[in-house]
Amino acid sequence: MTERIRARGPRSSSVNSVPLILDIEDFKGDFSFDALFGNLVNDLLPSFLDEEADSGDGHGNIAGVDGLTNGHLRGQSAPLSSAPFFPEVDGLLSLFKDACKELVDLRKQVDGRLNTLKKEVSTQDSKHRKTLTEIEKGVDGLFESFARLDGRISSVGQTAAKIGDHLQSADAQRETASQTIDLIKYLMEFNGSPGDLMELSALFSDDSRVAEAASIAQKLRSFAEEDIGRQGASTAAGNATPGRGLEVAVANLQDYCNELENRLLSRFDAASQRRDLSTMSECAKILSQFNRGTSAMQHYVATRPMFIDVEVMNSDIRLVLGDHGSQPSPSNVARGLSALFKEITDTVRKEAATITAVFPTPNEVMAILVQRVLEQRVTGILDKILAKPSLMSPPPVQEGGLLLYLRMLAVAYERTQELAKDLRAVGCGDLDVEDLTESLFSSHKDEYPEHERASLKQLYQAKMEELRAESQQVSESSGTIGRSKGASISSSLQQISVTFVTEFVRWNEEAITRCTLFSSQPATLAANVKAIFTCLLDQVSVYITEGLERARDSLSEAAALRERFVLGTSVSRRVAAAAASAAEAAAAAGESSFKSFMVAVQRCGSSVAIVQQYFANSISRLLLPVDGAHAASCEEMSTALSKAEAAAYKGLQQCIETVMAEVDRLLSSEQKSTDYRSPDDGIASDHRPTNACIRVVAYLSRVLESAFTALEGLNKQAFLTELGNRLEKLLLTHWQKFTFNPSGGLRLKRDLNEYVGFVKSFGAPSVDEKFELLGIIANVFIVAPDSLPTLFEGSPSIRKDAQRFIQLREDYKSAKLATKLSSLWPSLS
């Protein structure tokens, strides 16, 4: 377009140049107004373009800017004013006018062309619409033709289908009629003479057509039996016509089927010996027509070597039980059963491969095989290892007792369950192998709870007999090792042993493990667990109660020994010395029995804690699923342990009696009348406690050390509180036997300080309060008679005890204290 505009445009810059000629073609394609404008004015402005280029290079200024350097702009611009500044403007104006005129003309030409094209398009659109309408009418007619054709085709197809059905039905009827004719012919052959199978068609004696013969024989047999059944029903109704039936045919067919089945089984056995799986499969397929192949399946399973070889059973017994005559252990039996059942599983897996390749219904054969394995081979070995013992005369513990049977039962049950899972994985058809496995142990599981309880009882009795035997042996040998040492050993053997209780719990825990194994239902499990745990409660209750009673017997013997050496007042010095020596021995026996009982109490508490912890960790979770079971067991546990608590309470009372008796003996033997009424009153008094006080505190510290260790919690607090109260009463009674002067009163205060310091270790506030009051009361021996009325002004509650103590003052009569105090304390009168 640029070249065309240049060709038509004038080359001169004159205003009267030839007008431009613009063409419509110049505006087609990639039109650019800048290019059009440039081509119009480039020929008229060559000098302007050159100046513009020079200005772009930066070497001059437009309109003579260089003249400004001297500052004489007016002088320099005067010569330039005679020429026009832009001379090409007239030419450009003329050019633009001509271009505008031609553009208007071109627009008119374009508008004319557009109007013409619109008319042509409208005409063509009308023709096109008319054509489309005609085509739509033609298409509608075509669719109607297709619909009529489709209906015709459908009608013809239905007719053809009916004809085909008729032809197929006719062919089937023809085939059935042909087969019926053949069957009737064969049936007549079998309905000949009874037992005569020699005149049969060649089909029934051709070994290559055995399958066909078997199929036909089964059909004939079914038909004949149905016909006989219909005749029997008609005869029973009274409208039968006497005539010959198909009894002969049925009998002959039965004989033939039996003979054919035996022949096929013989061929099957021969092929089995050769491992000819294809022949075996062919025979099995044919035999499946006889009683669904049950005879073939059972025959195959029955002929397996593991069921007919006696050596296999002997090998099983040797593998599980070991050499003949040896006592099998549960661990050895477990290993033997694992090895045996692995061998059985491998054998069944190999047989499964053969069965799958041979029989048309392998799952049914596998069910028969697995059932035979469990009922014959597994049951055979279980009968050898699980001889149910009698509860009336159980085997002795030395030979394993009932526990050996229970352990064997658990091992056998676990291993058989594992075998059942393995056989299920190999495949056993529709056989409920788990239920069958359970049935193998049903007789054992029915009586299991009784055997478990009897076993626990047997173990406990054996342990007690062992303990009694050891104690008896020590008693018999005490003459050799010394009576005191022998008695000490015997006493230690009779003490409660936490180790024994732990062993009882271990027996029970093992029994609970077996109970969980054998009891699948939560209710049954809870009932059995409760019964077994009750056995433990009975055992622990009896054991610790008897242990506490034995410890109480020692306390009673020590008490009897003390009573034996209580003497009167008028005895000789020699007798008194002997009695004192015997009393020391009785005191030593009492102290020893006290410590022994505290050890028994401590071990009793530890034993109870072990049982309670065992119940919380192992028993309670098994009882919670059943309503009321947990609460009932908790109540039984409380009842069972209450007997031991009662024995412990009685023993602790005896311990207090023992301690008080020895304290009384020490006070009586060691306390001198001069301790509290020294003849040298007024001289510097002795600030040491009396010898009796020292002996009593030393004894109490020594003997109660075991009580502090053995008792805890509320039991300890109650025991020490009772002991402190008894000690306070005993001291009051003891001091009322003496007369006190002021120095004796100070000695008494020193004794009281010792007692108060000791009883503070009891941690019993009520006891501390009583001994503090004793310290206040003891002041009556120290103060002057005139100060007595004001001594108890703030403590009226102790005036009664103070009254008794005031009467013990040495100057009670001489100072006429009774008269002085009667007016203040009326109770003194």
Swiss-Prot record:
Complexes and interactors: The exocyst complex is composed of SEC3, SEC5, SEC6, SEC8, SEC10, EXO70A1 and EXO84B. Interacts with EXO84B. Binds to EXO70E2.
Pfam families named in the record: Sec10_HB (PF07393), Sec10_N (PF20667)
Gene3D superfamilies to which the protein is assigned, alphabetical: 1.20.58.1970
Keyword Nucleotide-binding annotated: no
GO annotation, cellular component aspect: cytosol; exocyst; extracellular exosome; membrane; plasma membrane; plasmodesma
Domain of life: Eukaryota
Zinc-finger listed as a keyword: no
Regions annotated as coiled coil: 244-266
BP GO annotations: acceptance of pollen; exocytosis; Golgi to plasma membrane transport
Organism field: Arabidopsis thaliana (Mouse-ear cress)
Family as reported in the entry's similarity comment: Belongs to the SEC10 family.
Tissue: Expressed in seedlings, roots, leaves and flowers.
Consequences of knocking out this gene: No visible phenotype, due to the redundancy with SEC10a.
Subcellular localization: Cytoplasm, Cytosol; Secreted, Extracellular exosome
Alphabetized UniProt keyword annotations: Coiled coil, Cytoplasm, Exocytosis, Secreted, Transport
Protein name per Swiss-Prot or TrEMBL: Exocyst complex component SEC10b
Function, in words: Component of the exocyst complex involved in the docking of exocytic vesicles with fusion sites on the plasma membrane during regulated or polarized secretion. Involved in polarized cell growth and organ morphogenesis. During cytokinesis, involved in cell plate initiation, cell plate maturation and formation of new primary cell wall.
